[in-house]
């Protein structure tokens, strides 16, 4: 199978005309197309992270599309690391698509071996939502990033980020949420990225306000925003290590410092002095030299962040393994930095609250507006989703198929989904709605450097939980179920359930979504978190062990 270099203009189909034999298959096909439409490098099927792919290659993509268009409503497509390998007669209640992406056994899952397996066309880096067709653009993590910044304000800055400066790096498909999230939280946010294309994309989609022409220009702009106590964002093109050092020399003292660069040297971390294209070429021709140069740059990058910390900034990693890689590069103090999960997100996970999302298969923004209305008439005024929806309407542009992210907890996701299914059935919503989520959720991931870092009981690396999550999703009839690994660093599960207005969809939605959040609550209760134990008791989840017969 040959890589295709001529770009295709892949766009998700809109409207209510079917190309497949049912709305379940059609919606999944549109989600795949939507991934490509929103991808950072669609000509290579790369969606984000400079490497996370939607399919192994274009031949595999075409075979997936062809199968989705012709398969029956009682068949299941099986995909192995972006390659369709089988179509099986199952039953109407079974998932239509099962995917296992990037899973490599234990000691063979390190960076170098994974990179070699990718080069040989045997696996892919799946990301969390790229290879299972659940990506909705940078919006996918904007609320979680916003929530982290707001929580930082509450914990460290008296409840407000007005007049505060956030410094960060990385403006790709994931990191691109940071400047908008910081602006929404009221901060003056400065984001550095070595790739001008990434910053231009964020500018064009409303996630970034302006791109500075130099470090001095960026400093002047960000200081003006902070002095005026206005939320806003500034981008600057440059290597994070170089720019962070320059900003420190010029006496910028940010209040919050974090980072969402792709720090994997094989897949996108750019050494100082090289362009992204030059770095990619060096990885191909001399990977050992690329690794050495990247490690030297990353060490400078981490030391700059530590200097900001020593000057009083709140500094934390945003889940990109910067700390572990910096420690390996000779900066042991980087391991002292906390994670955004342990600082801000874990209390939400204990209540089953996480990044739920819904996508309008019709492509009609009116369908999302209808769901906004359902939310506003269903959830109490003080609920975080009620606070979020007006902000999302104001600030977030749709990318590809109209979609929303909204953090909801146990029982709340199914409550919304059932009301939406009714609206599809009676025509208030014009076509099916796909409900899915990030893999960053309570019960769907084992990631000792991120979601499950420093678990109370030491169960950081126990990966039974995402496996159980995926098996539950299959048992309950999710339309699509995926199991992913990020090399030797994490394992995760994803699922999509489709509201097509039918009674069967209603049954599936209730079962799938309640089990998804329920296993998350149980996971944290099992680890000893009191809030999770209270939530488990409130909802009658779990099994009591001990205490007699």
From Swiss-Prot:
One of its GO terms (molecular function) is urocanate hydratase activity. The keyword Nucleotide-binding applies. It is an enzyme of class 4 (lyase). Belongs to the urocanase family. S-methyl thiourocanate hydratase subfamily. Its EC number is 4.2.1.-. NCBIfam families: hutU (TIGR01228), PRK05414.1 (NF003820). This is S-methyl thiourocanate hydratase. Pfam families: Urocanase, Urocanase_C, Urocanase_N. InterPro entries: Urocanase-like (IPR023637), Urocanase_C (IPR035401), Urocanase_central_sf (IPR038364), Urocanase_CS (IPR023636), Urocanase_N (IPR035400), Urocanase_Rossmann-like (IPR035085), Urocanase_sf (IPR036190). NAD(+) binds at residues 49, 173-175, 193, 198, 239-240, 260, 270, 318. Hydratase involved in the catabolism of S-methyl ergothioneine. Catalyzes the 1,4-addition of H(2)O to S-methyl thiourocanate, leading to the formation of S-methyl-thiohydantoin-5-propanoate, the second step in S-methyl ergothioneine degradation. Cannot use urocanate or thiourocanate as substrate. Binds 1 NAD(+) per subunit. Coiled coil: none annotated. The keyword Mitochondrion does not apply. Its cofactor is NAD(+). It catalyses: S-methyl-(E)-thiourocanate + H2O = S-methyl-thiohydantoin-5-propanoate. SUPFAM superfamilies: Urocanase (SSF111326). One of its GO terms (biological process) is L-histidine catabolic process to glutamate and formate. Keywords: Lyase, NAD, Nucleotide-binding.
